[in-house]
Curated annotation (Swiss-Prot):
Phosphoserine PTM sites in chain numbering: 27, 141
Protein name: Negative cofactor 2 complex subunit alpha
Summary of the function given for this chain in its UniProt record: Component of the NC2 complex which represses RNA polymerase II transcription through binding to SPT15/TBP and thereby inhibiting the assembly of the preinitiation complex. The NC2 complex may also mediate transcriptional activation from TATA-driven promoters through association with SPT15/TBP.
A Pfam family matched in the record: CBFD_NFYB_HMF
GO biological process terms on file: cellular response to heat; negative regulation of RNA polymerase II transcription preinitiation complex assembly; negative regulation of transcription by RNA polymerase II; positive regulation of transcription by RNA polymerase II; RNA polymerase II preinitiation complex assembly; transcription by RNA polymerase II
Family listed: Belongs to the NC2 alpha/DRAP1 family.
Gene designation: BUR6
Amino acid sequence: MADQVPVTTQLPPIKPEHEVPLDAGGSPVGNMGTNSNNNNELGDVFDRIKTHFPPAKVKKIMQTDEDIGKVSQATPVIAGRSLEFFIALLVKKSGEMARGQGTKRITAEILKKTILNDEKFDFLREGLCVEEGQTQPEEESA
């Protein structure tokens, strides 16, 4: 019993897309890492992040859903890191859109245009404010 290795709760860092391991053929494993230039830029942005989402708060938010029972220790950490990657990508794409319009600021309108123009963010479209003159689909009540 004295030869047991202590169990640590610290997880290894999650590798961003630009650090995906290569298979024997020299291509990225899986379908990630298709555009290495954009991934390197996103990795640079992500490397500068000094703050992280607190896993305890992420866990509390996850457990507000009735369908979620027990949550392992790694799950909130991974969810927080995924959220950081997502936000970094949204800010990067919005910054490109702002530069394309000749401005240095990311406004709500630029965020909205980014979400509407990029298919990666199509799941956010239902949460956008609806323009005047457009009708928002009514939710069905059960």
